[in-house]
């Protein structure tokens, strides 16, 4: 059952409790934070303990440590209005708490409907795309914050400026990350939509690229204005945008960032608007993909009326979100970095950036690394099956590769979609590249100890629980100084 309502304040009574099943999820926790900070009575449940849950409890949110029918009985007792229950696509119909909510005839709302209401209730910017949407929405939120716009933000990652994925601002704008994985972003009707790029992913939901294109078109058509990436061939061919940006050309686009210098610690570029040079920027982040993400954020700010000078000054405070080339600490001379890359294009972009850090000898890491040990955890059998050889090609950019078992994300195994199959594909494409496969997480830690060298960059990539690898290295030199990710 799904309920469409808008605006939020005209439908939700602050005296009506709102309960999130799976509140520790990165998208759910952001919404819960927004609502509790707007005076709503919020509760939730999650079988995982993470930083998101800790933050919610600190805000006074009651979070149950399991998901059971008893939780529904508890939240329905001694209330004047029956609770509204919020779920995400990750919650199966067999969930005992969801089944109890249905038996109690509670209204059940998908998180996308709640986010859609927030987006439509005020001027908003919704950032979508196959890759870079979390980084772009984080950079945009930070630029708006540092230029005294104080936006409300609902992001799928930790925004370092707020140390949170959700923030209630006093400014007029809301920034939201629009996730395409289940198609629910078609409900969002933003003042400005942003699409970073587009290519096939989430093959558990989309049978082919055309289905994904049609979904993203519906998202774009629902926005009052659309800002899109001119460098993406699919967007360029299939979409009619209000404005375009590029990091390759200033001709025929509204905004461009043309790189002058790409180093391992920063990027210097000239900014153009309508073909006119506006000035030079220094982005404190490496990688051409990050320059594109930053250009999208800059363009969105300019479309919302901010001066170029203000935006230019705000760039100095930019940081990527958590789990995006996230330095976690050191272990016996090895530097451990965690990254969310889980699609071949993301793996390639992350390794290209890592290689730039190695070759340039310049880095924001404590020490410039000498070699790249990629530790990759495939995410979902469906994605591994579809992109097996693309993953093999992308991982070839490392100096050595360790593979964790596939993180199922609730999917059933698919024959041939295994880490062993991926290792075989890597050996075929890159015969001289050292590759090893771990049978479990404990063995993965042993393989890191065995195959890594002093001076290595140990780059853990994946969207599952690979971000726990640094914890497994029990002798991490500065573990106490590196807090766990909110998405952990």
UniProtKB/Swiss-Prot annotation:
It catalyses: UDP-N-acetyl-alpha-D-muramate + L-alanine + ATP = UDP-N-acetyl-alpha-D-muramoyl-L-alanine + ADP + phosphate + H(+). ATP binds at residues 129-135. Its EC number is 6.3.2.8. One of its GO terms (biological process) is cell division. It is found in: Cytoplasm. Pathway: Cell wall biogenesis; peptidoglycan biosynthesis. Keywords: ATP-binding, Cell cycle, Cell division, Cell shape, Cell wall biogenesis/degradation, Cytoplasm, Ligase, Nucleotide-binding, Peptidoglycan synthesis. Disulfide bonds: none annotated. Its main location: cytoplasm. GO terms for cellular component: cytoplasm. It is an enzyme of class 6 (ligase). GO terms for molecular function: ATP binding; UDP-N-acetylmuramate-L-alanine ligase activity. The keyword Ligase applies. Cell wall formation. Belongs to the MurCDEF family. This is UDP-N-acetylmuramate--L-alanine ligase. It comes from Prochlorococcus marinus (strain MIT 9313). The lineage of its organism: Bacteria, Bacillati, Cyanobacteriota, Cyanophyceae, Synechococcales.
């Amino acid at each position: 059952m799904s309920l469409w309502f808008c605006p939020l304040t005209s439908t939700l009574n602050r005296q009506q409790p709102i309960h999130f099943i799976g509140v520790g999820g990165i998208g759910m926790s952001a919404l819960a934070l927004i609502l509790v900070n707007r005076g709503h009575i919020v509760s939730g449940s999650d079988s995982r303990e993470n930083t998101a849950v800790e933050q919610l409890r600190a805000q006074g949110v009651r979070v149950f440590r399991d998901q059971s029918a008893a939780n529904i009985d508890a939240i329905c007792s001694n209330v004047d209005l029956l609770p509204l229950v919020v779920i995400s696509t990750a919650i199966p119909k067999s969930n005992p708490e969801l089944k109890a909510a249905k038996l109690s005839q509670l209204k059940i709302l998908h998180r996308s409907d709640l986010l859609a209401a927030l987006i439509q209730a005020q001027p908003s910017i919704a950032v979508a795309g196959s890759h870079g949407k979390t980084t772009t929405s984080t950079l945009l939120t930070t630029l708006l914050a540092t230029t005294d716009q104080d936006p409300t933000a609902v992001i799928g990652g930790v925004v370092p400026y707020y140390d949170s994925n959700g923030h209630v601002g006093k400014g007029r704008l809301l920034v939201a990350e629009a996730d395409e994985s289940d198609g629910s972003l078609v409900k969002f009707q933003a003042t400005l939509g942003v699409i970073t790029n587009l290519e096939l992913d989430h093959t558990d939901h989309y049978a082919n690229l055309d289905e994904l294109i049609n979904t993203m078109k519906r998202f774009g058509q629902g926005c009052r204005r659309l800002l899109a990436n001119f460098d993406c061939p699919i967007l360029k061919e299939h979409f009619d945008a209000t404005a375009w940006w590029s990091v390759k050309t200033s001709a025929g686009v509204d905004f461009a960032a043309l790189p002058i210098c790409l180093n391992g610690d920063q990027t210097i570029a000239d900014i153009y608007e309508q073909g006119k040079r506006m000035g030079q920027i220094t982005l404190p982040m490496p990688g051409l993909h990050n320059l594109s993400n930053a250009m999208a954020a800059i363009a969105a700010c300019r479309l919302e009326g901010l001066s170029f000078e203000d935006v230019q000054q705000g760039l100095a405070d930019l940081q990527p979100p958590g789990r995006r080339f996230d330095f976690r600490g050191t272990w016996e001379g090895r530097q451990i970095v965690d990254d969310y890359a889980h699609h071949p294009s993301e793996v390639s972009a992350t390794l290209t950036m890592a290689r730039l850090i190695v070759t340039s000898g310049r880095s924001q890491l404590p020490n410039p690394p000498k070699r790249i040990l990629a530790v990759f955890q495939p995410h979902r059998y469906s994605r591994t099956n579809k992109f097996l050889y693309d993953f093999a090609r992308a991982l070839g950019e490392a100096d050595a590769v360790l593979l964790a078992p596939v993180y199922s994300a609730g999917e059933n195994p698919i024959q041939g979609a295994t880490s062993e199959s991926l290792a075989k594909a890597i050996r075929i494409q890159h015969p001289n590249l050292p590759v090893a496969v771990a049978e479990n997480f404990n063995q993965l830690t042993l393989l890191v100890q065995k195959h890594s060298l002093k001076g290595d960059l140990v780059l853990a990539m994946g969207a599952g629980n690979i971000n726990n690898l640094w914890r497994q290295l029990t002798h991490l030199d500065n573990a106490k100084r590196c807090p766990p990710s909110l998405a952990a």
